Amino acid sequence: MREPFVICGEGRTVIRRSPKDVLEFVLDVDQYRRADLKIGRVHYVHRDGNEGEVRHGGRLLGLPAPPAVLAFTLSPYSRLDFRGVAMPWPLRGFNGFFTCQESAEGTIVVHRECFIFGRVSGQLFKLALGWWLKLDTPAEVLRMKRLLEREAP
């Protein structure tokens, strides 16, 4: 089998909220989609403690995309991992995470997301969308910062 083609984006910022506030905001997918414009309609979120699954539609450059199912694992409250369980063509998988580390200035948040394609479709999507993902993930983290700091208690 050929090696997959992976396209990633990463963003980081400091948010003046607790790690718990940050990660619980991400897990409230209906709210988080205000920061992550790649999330379309949320079909469901099932959570059992620190694990669960979410199914949501996608959006690429504002255009609707088929739904994906992601499993998640929360390591309270330092890390949140997402893994693709059922992905629409041409995706073969997805891996993403958020890490949170407390600092004197606030919570240092790092978000990385990687879309996994086949070799040929990946090359095409890198040309078409790779630039956008590299810009969108850092912008997503900044949108999250603005939303969370505006709603601070």
Language-model segments: which ranges?
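Hydrophobic residues on conserved beta-strands that form the core of alpha/beta folds
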Residues: 10, 109-110
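Residue-level detection of beta-strand scaffold positions
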Residues: 14-16, 82-84, 111-113, 134, ...
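A conserved amphipathic terminal alpha-helix motif
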Residues: 116-153
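Hydrophobic-ligand binding "helix-grip"
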Residues: 4, 33-37, 43-44, 48, ...
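Short, charged, surface-exposed hinge/linker loops at domain edges
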Residues: 53-54
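Residues that form or flank phosphate/diphosphate-binding pockets in enzymes
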Residues: 17, 91-92, 119-120
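Hydrophobic ligand-binding cavity/cleft-lining segments
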Residues: 1-50
